[in-house]
Amino acid sequence: MRKSYRIKKELEFQKVFETRNSFANKKFVVYVMDKPEQPHFRVGISVGKKIGNAVMRNYTKRRIRQSILEFKPLLRQDVDFLVIARPQASGLPMNEVKQQLEHVFKLAGLFASKQSEEE
């Protein structure tokens, strides 16, 4: 995923957190902020220190990033969102990560509707 698709700065993370528009399941929490002027979505990924050592945290982030990349054509383009991994997300197989993220993205309404794809 290109850098233009990522949220990196702490101030940008805080703006999304402050919207308090969150959706969660047992493995992930997603915060969403609408940004209609934006040409494409941006994502921030946070994996806390409760998830293993640095190797395990980076492994988890890579799996989240790969899942988002696979969902990219289906996602709304006018949002910033943060994905926060809960400790239960540690060591999940790729198909489970993708399934759990799909569930929480549906709750958050991050998938573009069929009508907007046809326009």
Swiss-Prot record:
Q: How does it assemble?
A: Consists of a catalytic RNA component (M1 or rnpB) and a protein subunit.
Q: Which InterPro entries does this chain map to?
A: Ribosomal_Su5_D2-typ_SF, Ribsml_uS5_D2-typ_fold_subgr, RNase_P
Give GO MF terms, alphabetically: 3'-tRNA processing endoribonuclease activity; ribonuclease P activity; tRNA binding
Question: Which top EC class is named for this enzyme in its record?
Answer: hydrolase
Q: What does this protein do?
A: RNaseP catalyzes the removal of the 5'-leader sequence from pre-tRNA to produce the mature 5'-terminus. It can also cleave other RNA substrates such as 4.5S RNA. The protein component plays an auxiliary but essential role in vivo by binding to the 5'-leader sequence and broadening the substrate specificity of the ribozyme.
One GO biological process term = tRNA 5'-leader removal
- Keywords, sorted A to Z: Endonuclease, Hydrolase, Nuclease, RNA-binding, tRNA processing
Q: Which GO terms describe its cellular component?
A: ribonuclease P complex
Q: What SUPFAM superfamilies does the entry give?
A: Ribosomal protein S5 domain 2-like
Is Nuclease among this UniProt entry's keywords? yes
Kindly state which reaction or reactions the protein catalyses: Endonucleolytic cleavage of RNA, removing 5'-extranucleotides from tRNA precursor
Q: Which gene encodes it?
A: rnpA
The EC number on file is 3.1.26.5
- UniProt name for this protein: Ribonuclease P protein component
Q: Which NCBIfam families match?
A: rnpA
Give the protein family: Belongs to the RnpA family.
